[in-house]
């Protein structure tokens, strides 16, 4: 296995394991700093939006233009971009809102857990773990492909997705812990949901390695850009605003874009 593949896989694994951090927060503390969470999620959205539109979309277009010509290359980049959005939106739609970790208020779970039926809480946590696993699969592919293309790009996306995964880990562990009072169960299930990211990377690698051409790279990368834009707009920003002030979320967003822009400029 080449160093670049090992590096990209390691990034994906670390990003996925960030759900474990969220799970620890879920059963060790009832006090999640909402302002810090708002800024962090906004920052993550900024990184992902900037890199999707400025770097990944452009790389996809360049790769497809080499194979298909400028006009056809651009058309197929746009098509693949919206296919990526459609796929992740469909996954999101197929997960019922109550069990979807992106539709849940984890603060409310913590505050009202004593009044809830424990079996219902446990079911919520288990379905949240399943939902997060489904969502993390394409995110793992996005991180892996980015790491293969450009180490700096891969690190930035891995950090953004890791930040995104922390509240997801909390969404799994909080209901399971308050239902079972078992830290071990809460941590293990949250941890396993995060492993869907490296599994997505492995699956993507084995499926695409025999077909890996400029055309394949361009189509997959454009789809990855669409997936990341959807995650940012549908999950990260709404969740950031739910936990804190609108302007804090936007400040984090701009900060993430700025940091990403500077980091890309430094490695030109």
From Swiss-Prot:
A Pfam family annotated for this UniProt entry: Zip
Binding site for Fe(2+): 136, 139, 165, 168, 197
Entry coiled-coil feature ranges: none
Protein's membrane topology: Multi-pass membrane protein
UniProt keyword annotation of Iron present: yes
Annotated TM spans: 5-25, 38-58, 72-92, 124-144, 152-172, 187-207, 211-231, 248-268
Record has Ion transport as a keyword: yes
GO MF assignments: metal ion binding; zinc ion transmembrane transporter activity
Cellular location(s): Cell inner membrane
Chief location category: membrane
Keywords of the record: Cell inner membrane, Cell membrane, Ion transport, Iron, Membrane, Metal-binding, Transmembrane, Transmembrane helix, Transport, Zinc, Zinc transport
Binding site for Zn(2+): 139, 164, 168
Gene Ontology cellular-component terms listed: plasma membrane
Reaction catalysis annotation: Zn(2+)(in) = Zn(2+)(out)
Family statement drawn from the similarity comment of this UniProt entry: Belongs to the ZIP transporter (TC 2.A.5) family. ZupT subfamily.
Function: Mediates zinc uptake. May also transport other divalent cations.
Entry-linked HAMAP family: ZupT
Family annotation (NCBIfam families): PRK04201.1
Descriptive protein name: Zinc transporter ZupT
Provenance organism: Chlorobaculum parvum (strain DSM 263 / NCIMB 8327) (Chlorobium vibrioforme subsp. thiosulfatophilum)
């Amino acid at each position: 296995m080449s160093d670049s593949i090992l590096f990209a896989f390691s990034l994906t694994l670390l990003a996925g394991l960030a759900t474990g951090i969220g799970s620890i927060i879920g059963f060790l503390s009832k006090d999640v700093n909402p302002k810090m969470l708002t800024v962090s999620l906004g920052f993550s959205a900024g990184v992902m939006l900037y890199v999707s539109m400025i770097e990944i979309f452009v790389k996809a277009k360049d790769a497809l233009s080499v194979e298909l010509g400028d006009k056809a290359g651009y058309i197929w980049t746009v098509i693949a971009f919206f296919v990526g959005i459609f796929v992740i939106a469909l996954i999101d739609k197929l997960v019922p809102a109550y069990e979807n970790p992106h539709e849940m208020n984890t603060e409310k779970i913590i505050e009202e857990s004593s009044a809830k039926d424990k079996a219902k809480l446990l079911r919520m946590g288990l379905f949240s773990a399943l939902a997060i696993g489904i969502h993390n699969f394409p995110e793992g592919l996005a991180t892996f492909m980015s790491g293969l293309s450009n180490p700096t790009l891969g690190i930035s996306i891995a950090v953004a997705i890791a930040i995104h995964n922390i509240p997801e880990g909390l969404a799994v562990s909080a209901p399971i812990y308050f239902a079972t009072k078992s830290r071990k169960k809460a941590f293990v299930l949250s941890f396993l949901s995060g492993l869907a990211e490296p599994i997505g990377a492995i699956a993507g690698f084995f499926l695409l390695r025999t077909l890996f051409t400029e055309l394949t790279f361009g189509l997959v990368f454009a789809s990855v850009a669409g997936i990341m834009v959807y995650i940012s707009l549908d999950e990260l920003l709404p969740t950031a605003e739910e936990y804190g002030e609108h302007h804090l979320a936007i400040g984090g967003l701009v900060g993430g874009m700025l940091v990403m822009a500077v980091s890309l400029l430094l490695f030109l």
